[in-house]
Amino acid sequence: SSLPQTFRDLALIRQVSAEFDSTPPQQVIDRLKPLATPGHAWFGSAGELTALAYVKMGKDNLAGPIFAQIAKQDDLPQTLRSRSQQMAGALGVDTVQVDAKRKAPSKTDKTASKGE
């Protein structure tokens, strides 16, 4: 194909998402495996679909950590991180530390509040 890999990856995610309910979970996992790794441009979307496929298979022990990894990614949309944090928690993976780090004031915040 003459399209850049990024567009082909996006097309794959959209196809898997559209066909998710009728696709065997293991096939979803296999198709998205190269994209469902932290640091990959499509990790958020591919990781969420992969984790949901694991939930569908009853493998919550594999889904929870993926949701937790998504929740830790500051470069992903807040809605996806929040949803992933909730899913991880529901699956027994503690993400409170992840949220606490995000809400902790930085050194500049502490300095700014002293002047008020």
Question: Which residue stretches match the model-derived regions?
Answer:
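Soluble extracytoplasmic domains of inner/organellar membrane proteins
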Residues: S1-S106, K114-E116
